[in-house]
């Protein structure tokens, strides 16, 4: 793709690569080969704790990238998005699930002003689910009721799950029962029923559904004034004032 046009491509003296933990090594090699000038400075930023695609790590449990000539600089260790309460939760989670996989921080430094004036409220709820059920009605109903009861502003709300089946049901409830506009990265319930009329589990997909998901993800916008629903892999939701996170029992701790 690039080789036949390499002389026409722009070359840059400085290249900044963010979220490097999501990159395959070959992608970075392409950037270096076709877009970097001869003496270009390439700076990569990565967070191994967000290695959701399970990219290979080096001997120090850090992202492996071809531009690296020395050890990773760990000076960027202060969070400007997490309050103290969330930071403590994140640290405990790392120690419980990531101790053998990553180098775990003993304490995350946070923004003091955020902790003073924007301390979050955290609740936990457990719902047993049956795989034979096509739609996760109990969870969808609970989240829908919470949004109505607390009168959350639509733009403040993000709902994340690894299970599109539940998100699809909740999106349908929000649109039909409360007339909410939503911002999603997957097919609607109506589209799913049309494209998979013989679905048995609610997890089925095909080329048409995958195309819809790709297009919706490309057009996803954080501040559209609507409730956002997404999978954990597509959107992390750190900036959302109100976040509903659905975690299934069958998720592997190493993922």
Regions found by a protein language model. Give the residues of each.
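A short acidic, Gly/Pro-enriched loop at the edge of an enzyme's catalytic core
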Residues: 10-12
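Conserved helicase motor core of SF1/SF2 NTP-dependent helicases
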Residues: 1-2, 14-255
């Amino acid at each position: 793709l690039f080789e036949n046009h390499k002389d026409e491509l722009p070359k840059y003296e400085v290249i900044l690569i963010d979220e490097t933990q999501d990159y395959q090594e070959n992608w970075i090699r392409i950037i270096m080969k076709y877009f970097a000038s001869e003496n270009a400075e390439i700076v990569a930023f990565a967070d191994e704790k967000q290695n959701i695609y399970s990219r290979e790590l080096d001997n120090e449990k850090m992202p492996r990238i071809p531009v690296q000539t020395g050890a990773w600089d760990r000076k960027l260790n202060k969070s400007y998005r997490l309050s103290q309460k969330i930071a403590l939760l994140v640290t405990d989670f790392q120690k419980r699930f990531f101790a053998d996989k990553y180098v775990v921080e003993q304490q995350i430094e946070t923004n003091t002003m955020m902790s003073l004036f924007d301390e979050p409220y955290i609740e936990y709820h457990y719902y047993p689910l049956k795989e034979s059920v096509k739609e996760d009605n109990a969870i969808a109903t609970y989240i829908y009721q919470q949004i109505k009861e607390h009168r959350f502003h639509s733009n403040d709300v993000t709902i994340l799950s690894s299970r599109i089946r539940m998100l699809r049901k909740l999106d349908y409830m929000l649109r039909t029962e409360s007339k909410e506009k939503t911002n999603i990265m997957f097919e609607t319930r109506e589209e799913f029923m049309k494209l998979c009329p013989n679905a048995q589990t609610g997890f089925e997909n095909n080329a048409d559904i995958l195309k819809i998901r790709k297009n919706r993800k490309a057009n996803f916008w954080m501040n559209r004034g609507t409730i956002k629903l997404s999978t954990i892999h597509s959107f992390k939701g750190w900036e959302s004032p109100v976040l509903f996170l659905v975690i299934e029992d069958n998720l592997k701790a190493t993922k």
